[in-house]
Amino acid sequence: MQLTKITGRLPLFAFIMLMCASSHAAAQAGSLDPTFGNKGVATAPMGAKAIAIQSDGKIVVAGAGVSNSQFFDTLLRLNTDGSLDTTFGSGGIAYLTPPGAGSAPLGFFALAIQPNGEIVAAGATQTEQGGYTNFVQVALVESNGSLDTSFGSGGFTAPNMIAFTPYNVTGTEALALALESNGSILVATSYSNLLVRFTSSGQLDTTFGNGGIVNLANQGPNTSFAPTQIALEKNGKILVTSGGVAPAPLVQAGTISRYNINGSLDATFGAGGTAACVASASALLVQSNGKIVVAGSLTSKLNAPPAGNDVGFGVVRYNSSGILDKSFGSGGVAVADFGTSAPLSGAFAVAIQANDEIVAGGAAAQGALNQSFDSAFALARFTGAGALDTSFGSGGLVTTTLVSGSSNVYSYVTGLAIQTDGKIVAAGNTAVDQGFGSGTGAYVVRYLAQ
């Protein structure tokens, strides 16, 4: 009788186990994480430019936002489940503005978290000094979202660096940021193309370059190149990428340069300190083995079409000497083809997983060239050898449509981060009519890694 009862339960037990196994199998790498936000997606009333993950797993997003009809430098913090962290700022959002009359914040464009949990964010502020002029701004924010007033002036530093700009431009913005091991802060700026070092207290570090400022190599008025990212090698040397559209032919291109700790160009890297890049060099990281990974937009998979509109994902790897790593991809270059030739595809962010696999994030156009201005969040994952990881998404590629039912919706990833459990967190934005219409806000999306 007892044997009969046990045998009668076996089919139900087997069915439950089968369902569990099927559910696990369905959760493929690259799938949205259903435990985060709303089915893997969290939204925020701001524009997102950068993302970082704290040691406790909370997610910080930097950008710009509007509160009470005023524009602010904005930080957002999410709990690990994608909900707003109400212990941060006002209900999870910190709206910040630099002190001083006539200063208007333009937003944060870069972000890093110090070992003590304080947040460093960099961007730009606009002043009315002889007309509207943009200045670099760096802010130090306490873990509760309030400004650390011991830093700079009231928590912000925004030095006037126009005298250092090499091309007679009238302003500058911080686009990239990195923290050195001694607490110093490195910032790379647009328009003026400067590399700037601040002390941990927010002052220009006069031991670096010329009074704390270095004019970046291979930048000038004949290109649209601008600094995009900073990364530090284990020995403290400084890598800086710049990218844009080369003037002739019109193709996506970039450079990567290396600087010594004192700000001098490291002539042992590449050709005299700089290496060329076939991609727009939008993002930069250093792998655990010292190899250098650059991700960006690639024109026509290395062949320039008319007007340079055919753009895709490109990941380029260099040895530590600045020479292309020919063991990676095809001659050092790996390409992700999302099956479209519209001009809105490209990689803008990169992250490296614990196993040294590379995740690139950006936008994938949802239509043919000159026929659609729609794009989706896009990820591509590459193995350490530069091949697409076919266990991820569909053949190594993932696209996520965040806004449906509208036309000309441009969705794109601006930042990537990897959690300690390997999950991939992407931050980005959507905009209607390529950003010339109304925006729909920021999105933070979490993907399963395995």
Please report, for each region that a protein language model flagged, where it lies by residue.
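Extracytoplasmic mature domains of secreted or surface-exposed proteins
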Residues: 2-3, 20-450
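Bacterial N-terminal signal peptides that target proteins for export
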Residues: 2-13
